[in-house]
Amino acid sequence: MNPLTRRDIIAHQASVPWPHQRQVEQDLLLCRAMAALFNDTFLRGQIAMRGGTLLHKIHLAPAVRYSEDIDLVVFGNRPEDHVAKAIRRVLKPEFGAPTDSIWDTIRLAIRNTVRPSRVLRLTYSVASVIEPGASLDIVVEANVTERVPHRPVVAIPFAFAFREATIAAQVNGYDIHEMLGTKLRALFQ
């Protein structure tokens, strides 16, 4: 995809309620990441989206809550490292390589030990167009343990305007009932 410009971010501001251009920029980056992930043939057969970004950007659009990450669940039968390599391959043209932090690695190792599910986390640090010298973090997390969903994965249309075109994807995800149930469960945990 083409690098973002200040004009792209200002144009995207018309479609989101965020008061700060930095948030608008990060929202546009998330949109581009979602489209890239779910327009990839391999990943489309392996991952589904869940979490607040799916809930607010697709089910409850226009979004009323700001999102900073993409939560995925791996439902396909390919090994975790194949999925991780594919995510890196697909997002590299957009964000470069994910950043490595010893503290993030330690936190994730503790999290994966304490909780019954295992998570793969990739954090991308992207130079901001709106605030030169600053960076935006895009976090992609994939649960690699919960491979058999309680309810069926559904293809949900997702699209956003970018320059003179509309970028679209069929995002694998869960219906609104499953999403609200998941959020309610998280509140009680």
Predicted regions and their residues:
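Compositionally biased terminal segments of proteins
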Residues: M1-Q189
